[in-house]
């Protein structure tokens, strides 16, 4: 008998980190919750990272996911912004890992391909497919929608990921 698996998807960002929680049983997906954790742009970097940490820790504690999926970052022309995003991503990976969850990573193109069928697409296409895949899904803004898409990507890929990890562990 299959067990329902609760997945949290995290879309890291220093200003806004999106999160989305879904339940998956076999091929079925069920929306649980979504939102964003924000940091105060007037605060120093360390304080902002603490805000992200504390907010994500509360979400993980309250929703009790079984697995986490985090979007990989891309390198842009602004090296300072890329480094800050990398630090926010570190928090996004640390929080579920410290809670004992396995953490999986997905490239943005893989997330889009899992949700809309192609690796390059518009935000509106993601929003539309989220509503088709999970009609009861509620999300405010692109960050929460992206986080739900990341969770769905993991739900579609989790069997293969688990097998690869077992084989690598030897």
Swiss-Prot record:
Cofactor note: Binds 2 Mg(2+) ion per subunit.
Active site positions, chain numbering: 11, 71, 143
InterPro entries, per the entry: RNaseH-like_sf, RNaseH_sf, X-over_junc_endoDNase_Mg_BS, X-over_junc_endoDNase_RuvC
SUPFAM superfamilies referenced in this protein's UniProt entry, alphabetically: Ribonuclease H-like
PROSITE patterns reported for this sequence: RUVC
Keywords: Cytoplasm, DNA damage, DNA recombination, DNA repair, DNA-binding, Endonuclease, Hydrolase, Magnesium, Metal-binding, Nuclease
Protein family according to the UniProt entry: Belongs to the RuvC family.
Protein name: Crossover junction endodeoxyribonuclease RuvC
This protein's encoding gene: ruvC
């Amino acid at each position: 008998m299959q067990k329902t698996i609760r997945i949290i998807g995290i879309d890291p960002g220093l200003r806004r980190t999106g999160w989305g929680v879904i339940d998956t049983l076999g091929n079925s997906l069920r929306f649980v919750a979504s939102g964003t954790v924000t940091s105060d742009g007037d605060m120093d970097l360390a304080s902002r990272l603490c805000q992200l940490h504390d907010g994500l820790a509360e979400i993980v504690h309250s929703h009790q996911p079984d697995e986490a999926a985090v979007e990989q970052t891309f390198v842009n022309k602004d090296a300072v912004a890329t480094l800050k995003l990398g630090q926010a991503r570190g928090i996004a990976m640390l929080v579920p890992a410290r809670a004992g969850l396995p953490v999986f990573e997905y490239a943005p193109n893989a997330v889009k391909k899992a949700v809309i069928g192609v690796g390059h697409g518009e935000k509106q296409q993601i929003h539309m497919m989220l509503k088709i895949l999970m009609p009861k899904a509620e999300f405010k803004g692109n960050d929460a929608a992206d986080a739900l898409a990341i969770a769905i990507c993991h739900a579609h890929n989790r069997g293969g990921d688990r097998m690869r990890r077992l084989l690598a562990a030897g």
